[in-house]
Amino acid sequence: XEEFDYDLVIIGAG
């Protein structure tokens, strides 16, 4: 799908 896991980005950016 064309969906982005922002949750992972937020956690990773932490």
Swiss-Prot record:
Transmembrane parts of this sequence: none
MF terms (GO), sorted A to Z: oxidoreductase activity
Function field: Soluble hydrogenase catalyzes both production and consumption of hydrogen from suitable artificial electron donors or acceptors. This subunit (50 kDa) is required for hydrogen production with reduced methyl-viologen.
Protein's UniProt name: Soluble hydrogenase 50 kDa subunit
Species in which this protein is naturally found: Anabaena cylindrica
Principal subcellular localisation of the protein: cytoplasm
Entry keywords, A to Z: Cytoplasm, Oxidoreductase
Location of the protein in the cell: Cytoplasm
Oligomeric and partner information: Heterodimer of a large and a small subunit.
GO cellular component, one term: cytoplasm
Record has NADP as a keyword: no
EC number: 1.12.-.-
